[in-house]
A protein has these predicted regions:
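Active-site-proximal flexible loops/turns
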Residues: 38, 75, 124-126, 135, ...
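Short, solvent-exposed coil/turn elements at secondary-structure transition points
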Residues: 72, 93, 135, 187, ...
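Active-site microenvironment of metallo-dependent hydrolases
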Residues: 154-238
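His/Asp/Glu-enriched, well-ordered alpha-helical/loop segment
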Residues: 56-63, 105-188, 205
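Active-site core of metal-dependent hydrolases
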Residues: 1-123, 142-145
Length: 238
C-alpha cells in the first residue's frame, strides 16, 4: 500500500488499509516524521507520536518502508528496530523541503536497515550518494563520517530492501541473480581498484555517465539512448 503520511490519514483510512493488507499479504510505503508538523499534528490529535500511531494500526513490519523518519525520537526508533521496519533516506528531498537532516547514521548504528532514495527530487543516484556523504559530515561536524554508511545504504541495503519486496536476488552479479547491470563511461585519472572504487563512484561518476542499462537481462539503454521507445514522440505528446 502506498500511503502519504500520518498527518493526511484518518484512523478510518489506516484501519481500512490494515484490514485490506491482511487479505493481500502486503506491506506499506509511507512517509514517517518527515517534518515536525507530522509529529505535532499526531500528538495534538491522537496524543501519541507518529511511529506509535502506525504501530497501533499494525502498519509497521518487515514489509513496510518508512520514508525519512527525521523527527522520530529514541522510543520511535526502538519501535522501528523491533518491528523490522525498513527506513529510506532521501537527503536532497529533505534539504529542498527544509525539514531537517535524517538520523540515518544513528539508525544504521542501531541496527535498522536504511536504504538510499530520492523521494522524486532527482533521478540520479550518483548525486544522491554524493549529497548523503556530504550532509552527514556537515551535520555531525565529523569528516570521517559516512564513508562506509552511505555505500552500505546504496549498494547493500537497497539490495536487501528489493529482495524483501520482489522475488529474486538483486544488486549483485552472480549466477541466478536478476540480470540488472549498468555500464558507466568513466576514464579514471588515477588508478581504480578494489579498495578505492567507492571514492571513484563518489567523486568521478554521475548519472549522465551511464552508457548502457540492462534490466533483467534485457538491454534497454545503449550508447546513452533508449532502445525500446521513441523519445521524440513521447516528448512531443507530453
Amino acid at each position: 500500500f502506498g500511503m502519504h503520511a500520518s498527518f493526511t490519514l484518518s484512523d478510518r483510512s489506516l484501519e481500512k488499509c490494515m484490514n485490506a493488507s491482511k487479505e493481500l499479504d502486503c506491506g506499506y510505503h509511507i512517509h514517517v516524521a518527515e517534518g515536525l508538523a507530522d509529529e505535532e499534528k499526531c500528538i495534538e490529535e491522537h496524543h501519541i507520536r507518529v511511529v506509535e500511531r502506525l504501530k497501533k494500526f499494525n502498519i509497521l513490519g518487515e514489509k513496510t518502508i518508512a520514508v525519512h523518519c527525521i523527527h522520530a525520537d529514541d522510543n520511535e526508533r526502538d519501535i522501528i528496530l523491533e518491528t523490522g521496519t525498513t527506513v529510506v533516506h532521501n537527503p536532497e528531498s529533505n534539504m529542498g523541503n527544509a525539514v531537517g537532516v535524517s538520523p540515518a547514521i544513528n539508525l544504521i548504528a542501531k541496527g535498522i536497515t536504511v536504504g538510499l532514495g530520492t523521494d522524486g527530487y532527482t533521478s540520479d543516484m550518483f548525486e544522491s550518494m554524493k549529497v548523503a556523504n556530504i550532509i552527514h559530515k556537515h551535520h555531525l561536524k565529523d569528516p570521517s563520517i559516512a564513508w562506509g554508511e552511505v555505500p552500505m545504504m546504496l549498494f547493500e541495503n537497497n539490495r536487501k530492501i528489493a529482495e524483501k519486496h520482489f522475488n529474486g536476488t538483486f544488486g549483485i552479479i552472480e549466477e541466478g541473480a536478476v540480470g540488472d547491470v549498468i555500464v558507466v563511461d568513466y576514464n579514471p585519472l588515477t588508478p581504480m581498484n578494489g579498495s578505492n572504487y567507492n571514492s571513484h563512484i563518489l567523486f568521478g561518476m554521475m548519472g549522465k555517465s551511464v552508457d548502457t542499462t540492462i534490466v533483467n537481462g534485457k538491454v534497454l539503454v545503449k550508447d546513452g539512448k533508449l532502445l525500446n521507445i521513441n523519445e521524440d514522440e513521447i516528448l512531443a505528446k507530453s
